[in-house]
Amino acid sequence: AMSGFVIGNKTIYKNLHSLKAGEIVIFQGNSYEYLQYYKYFGEIINKSFEDYLKELSEVTLNIFRKMLNKIGDRQIIIPLSAGNDSRLVASILKHLGAKNVKCYSYGTPENFEVKIAKIISQKLDYEWKLIPLTHKSEKIFYASKDYKKYLDYSETYCSVPYIQSLSTVKYLKNINWINDDAIFINGNTGDFISGGHINLNILDASKLENIEFRKENILSQLIEKHFSLWGYLKTDLNKNNLKVNLWNEIVEGCSDIQKNSNDHLLYEYSEFIDRQSKYVISGQRIYEYYGYNWRLPLWNDEYLLFWQKVPLNYKLKQKLYIEMLKKNNFGNVWGDDIPVNKKKIT
């Protein structure tokens, strides 16, 4: 209840367990064993900022180029906001020559996200549609049978269903604005993978040698950001129980815990294995529910392998990511004349 997702391989049922991200089960006769074939935790490689900037540009272009080659002429639908990630998707597709692309946004016409998304779409020469949402329209939708059917469809027993944009995809389908074989591509989850969730306190604490102090700092940051949905549940008892479970999961999955340069990796590993893979990614089920395919280029294997080796000082405040976007200026939509939404890291 404090987060909307479970920790580890637990579910809401006592004797039912799930696989964690990057994990398989191998059965042999009457026995079985869990094997983690991938973890978002790597060896930090120290290179110059310029070298990393060049590599990130190449990796990003390569990922989208290969994806576009496989998609071919199929229609691409982009949920576009004023943030970096969906703008990257739209602008790099334009840079690579993709033509069969539509963008949409939702909310009120005077919303900052909507205004900027419209400007971006116009500059890229991509068709754009606003889906106006009101309290009344959303109240009607969330009381509908369709919404209840989606809850059953998307149940995983380890996370609450992701429902943001559910009504908007249905709206677009109902007005026949989307081809039946269209592919949705959103920006999940560029902000996390590029360092946008790392608090400056992680940097300050990582300069210390005391593992207990650093451990407490990492766990406190995780709880503050991801386990604070209900303030009245943040009792000392609940927080202490959370810390034990979170730290056990980190110790089980990560090596070199004593190394203070790995503090941000421990923090990101925990978010990756729980919140990102259980809750955030489940939002893709929305597209599946209405019969559409999707792609997640910013979760591509190449991106994971790249970002897990980047030093902390290049990831703080998304320094490397943002510099790459501005330097390449895909689609000419990365100037100061088209502002990015402001997000506060807590």
Residue ranges and their predicted role:
Residues A1-L80, N84-K136:
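Cysteine-centered catalytic environments shared across enzyme families
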Residues K20, D51, E55-V59, N84, ...:
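Generic recognition of stable, solvent-exposed alpha-helical segments in well-folded globular domains
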Residues N84-D85, P109-N111, H135-E138, N188-I193, ...:
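Short, solvent-exposed loop/turn segments at secondary-structure junctions
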Residues L96, I120, K145-K149, G195-R214, ...:
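Short secondary-structure boundary/capping segments
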Residues V114, K118-S154, K243, E249, ...:
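A conserved beta-strand->alpha-helix junction
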Residues A143-N201:
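Extended catalytic-interface subdomain
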Residues I211-K342:
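Conserved glycine-rich, hydrophobic/aromatic-active-site segments
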